[in-house]
UniProtKB/Swiss-Prot annotation:
Keywords: Cell membrane, Membrane, Transmembrane, Transmembrane helix. The keyword Cell membrane applies. InterPro entries: DUF5389 (IPR035333). It comes from the Bacteria. It holds the Pfam family DUF5389. The keyword Cell membrane applies. This is Uncharacterized protein PM1437. It is found in: Cell membrane.
Length: 103
């Protein structure tokens, strides 16, 4: 009798990718907010542009990094875990920097 090699559930890494990609669900809200940034008198034109670009582009960056980490996890799991952790720290660092108005 042949032993089946099917996963029994989600691995810790799969949960990590799911949590890493969770902010993608807020993308419609980001698209709604981004045109209203122009109305904020405290932001310079450069800050408004950078915030708009961040709000429009972050889901693509998260999805690209998640896909890369998933593919790397098949061959080099420790490296993939490190990449996912470092990417999460970098994303949330940028998020707080942008949300704080670049101060």
């Amino acid at each position: 009798m042949e032993r089946e090699n099917k996963p029994k559930g989600f691995s810790g890494f799969s949960w990590g990718i799911a949590l890493f990609c969770l902010p993608i669900l807020l993308w419609p809200l980001a698209l709604t907010i981004s045109p209203n940034l122009l109305k904020n008198p405290r932001l310079s034109e450069t800050e408004t542009t950078l915030m708009s670009v961040f709000l429009w582009a972050y889901p693509f960056g998260l999805a690209l990094i998640a896909r890369l980490a998933y593919r790397l996890n098949q061959h080099k799991p420790p490296f993939a875990r490190g990449l996912l952790g470092l990417s999460a720290v970098a994303f949330y660092g940028m998020l707080f920097y942008v949300a704080g108005g670049f101060h």
